Amino acid sequence: MSTDNKQSLPAITLAAIGVVYGDIGTSPLYTLRECLSGQFGFGVERDAVFGFLSLIFWLLIFVVSIKYLTFVMRADNAGEGGILTLMSLAGRNTSARTTSMLVIMGLIGGSFFYGEVVITPAISVMSAIEGLEIVAPQLDTWIVPLSIIVLTLLFMIQKHGTAMVGKLFAPIMLTWFLILAGLGLRSIIANPEVLHALNPMWAVHFFLEYKTVSFIALGAVVLSITGVEALYADMGHFGKFPIRLAWFTVVLPSLTLNYFGQGALLLKNPEAIKNPFFLLAPDWALIPLLIIAALATVIASQAVISGVFSLTRQAVRLGYLSPMRIIHTSEMESGQIYIPFVNWMLYVAVVIVIVSFEHSSNLAAAYGIAVTGTMVLTSILSTTVARQNWHWNKYFVALILIAFLCVDIPLFTANLDKLLSGGWLPLSLGTVMFIVMTTWKSERFRLLRRMHEHGNSLEAMIASLEKSPPVRVPGTAVYMSRAINVIPFALMHNLKHNKVLHERVILLTLRTEDAPYVHNVRRVQIEQLSLTFWRVVASYGWRETPNVEEVFHRCGLEGLSCRMMETSFFMSHESLILGKRPWYLRLRGKLYLLLQRNALRAPDQFEIPPNRVIELGTQVEI
């Protein structure tokens, strides 16, 4: 989205507030409460309050303002961001071994996101609904059911798209941030002493005074920056400048005022630690605050769900996940998609998490490991891009990496303390996703290599067919080919069993480029291989969905006319059997067979009319 038009800049910035900052913007609901709840062995003491506030503020400055907004967002692929984009950029100018390591890092980062995304909707909505405990303590037993009801409605509306609802996101989130600022400023005015915590020496003093406990407490401080990856991942939707402008003009001031306002309240009334956010508000404002907090957390959850859809589509297009049904919910915006399988799997996981953990404080113990792990990987990948792609001085890049890791590694290490109390959850989910992605990619490669290892030359076969043609039948046949120089299995089996060939034969290859979009001018490449054979290569970006009808429309514009309803599409359908393998590779093979059986069929994947498809089966041992 361009920001060149100055008149549109305020609207784009407002939209960025509504989508990008939902997660990090709802962190004040629970962050300071978890920091000072007594779990680390100290209560609401002046030095502890000042120390935590100083840590939170300077984390927002260093991690969000400097690392992500200033440095990481420089690394874009045609304006797009995200951990898989960073992985792709980092591996462009490196050796094969280094590229493999970077790919593994990127996949781990993507897997971590899947692990955390189960927790974000649960902890966000529950922390808002828990405001009921302040309004009416007798309703505390309704927190879990109400949280499930709210999230059920949210997941149910996904299939209708969020375009209409999304128009409300920005004004609601802007109102939310203004409320954060207003509540915090009101409390700070009553106790301005709290502003001393802006001095970073209070963070240093905190470590010196509380020693080992202060290090472990970093696991709670990191809650203030959860959602920071969204800034980079959503860069393609809004552009760098609007995201930066929204942060420095609205989000950062509002968060700072609210955190320090909560600190001022706790210095004055330590008993407010049971829920310092809601106790900032006067009694008459509690119910309206509860309502807008619930709306803000729903918006934060929506942003995460949309992020999962986008990451899944990117992983599918790059070949790391099996093809699945992707529905476009907007004719105008290609980024608005709905993936039913992912939506309902995520819903089931979120409900299980809510029922199992019962309170947002329990979920806070599960939060942070995957976030900080992704931060470490982002530091390594982004500095690799700076060195290999931007050709920055290696010593300067090394200093940047050391500075980032000096913050990231302590945060990650501190969160490892949460492993047994809930941190195992995102790690387990992330591990499962990593195994699934690497299994699909490696076994798919093994299958393709197995299918084509004994293949003949395509050029030689075409020359032979033109010289001694079989029976020719009227019409056009399209054979889907995974590689441009390989004879499609369906073509070989059609000749073997039916012993006929159509008057025109098109070998069609759909490939994904290392870019989010491919310009229509470069969409289709046509090459005539002989009098009756053509090769068509259609290129798509990883944010685009291939459409065969569109491909042949482009072919018609370039002189190769082809009517969809008068064309036969031949595809091979592999029946896979496992060969002899070690037990661990056999398990991986069985997982691949399960994924293959449930993958979206090629005709549905490429939107080919079912009555024009002929599938020819073949058995392959892998």
Swiss-Prot record:
Catalytic activities: K(+)(in) + H(+)(in) = K(+)(out) + H(+)(out)
Primary localization: membrane
Entry keywords, A to Z: Cell inner membrane, Cell membrane, Ion transport, Membrane, Potassium, Potassium transport, Symport, Transmembrane, Transmembrane helix, Transport
A single GO cellular-component term on record: plasma membrane
Transmembrane segments annotated in the record for this chain: 9-29, 49-69, 103-123, 137-157, 165-185, 213-233, 247-267, 276-296, 337-357, 363-383, 396-416, 419-439
Mitochondrion in keyword set: no
GO MF annotation: an example: symporter activity
Bilayer topology annotation: Multi-pass membrane protein
Statement: the UniProt record of this protein carries the keyword Ribosomal protein: no
Protein's cellular compartments: Cell inner membrane
Top-rank taxon: Bacteria
Role description: Responsible for the low-affinity transport of potassium into the cell. Likely operates as a K(+):H(+) symporter.
Family: Belongs to the HAK/KUP transporter (TC 2.A.72) family.
Protein's UniProt name: Low affinity potassium transport system protein Kup
